[in-house]
Amino acid sequence: MKQILQNLSNGETSLIDVPCPKNIKSNILIATTTTVVSAGTERMLIDFGKANLLSKAKKQPDKVKMVLNKVITDGLMTTVDAVRSKLDQPLPLGYCNAGVILESNVDGFEPGDRVVSNGNHAEVVRVPKNLCVKIPDNVDDESASFTVLGAIGLQGIRLIQPTMGECFVVTGLGLIGLLCVQMLRANGCRVLGIDFDSKKCELAQQ
């Protein structure tokens, strides 16, 4: 099957042939019909991969501390080999997937069901049952594939527990930011959206 993978050492992405995953307990095997490319997260990963080692270190100070601790415990060369090995591991891209179930080891999900999940950009994906939900008959796959992005915003909103009439500022009016604005408004909140990009601000006002 085909899958999009990224090389973290240089940021290059490739569409390659990989073995089809086998299903396991409490998981669902899905034939992909559509996926969403996240302009924020996935572009950030590609930019991170293209950066030199110093820039990568600056972007992940917590990982630098882990590497320094490993140097102390395991030695410099062992640590260098481990870092290079990690950067050379292909990274699957994508986390917004819609498709049709091929195999299911989970009650409530049957082969042929249309579902949305956090699966990668691949022809076939395997996901745990808690990261998969059925698509209603009146929703097409393309629209449903945006569900995960909405869920990310919704989780943030649940954490702040908004109440009717409260005022909130949403900083960043990308797709998730726009979804947060709409969900907060639907919850009866007053919302101010902020973004450096005037085009995104104009879109938010439509």
What are the roles of these predicted feature ranges?
Residues 130-142:
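Glycine/charged-rich beta-loop-alpha catalytic/anionic-binding loops adjacent to active sites
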Residues 1-38, 42-45, 108, 113, ...:
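Conserved, well-structured beta-alpha core segment at the onset of a catalytic domain
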Residues 21-36, 49-118:
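Glycine-rich beta-strand-centered segment in the early N-terminal region that forms part
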Residues 143-206:
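Mid-domain Rossmann-like dinucleotide-binding core that forms the NAD(H)/NADP(H) cofactor-binding site
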Residues 92, 118-130:
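A structural motif shared across PLP-dependent enzymes of the aminotransferase-like
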Residues 97, 105, 120-121, 131, ...:
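A generic "binding-loop/recognition-motif" signal
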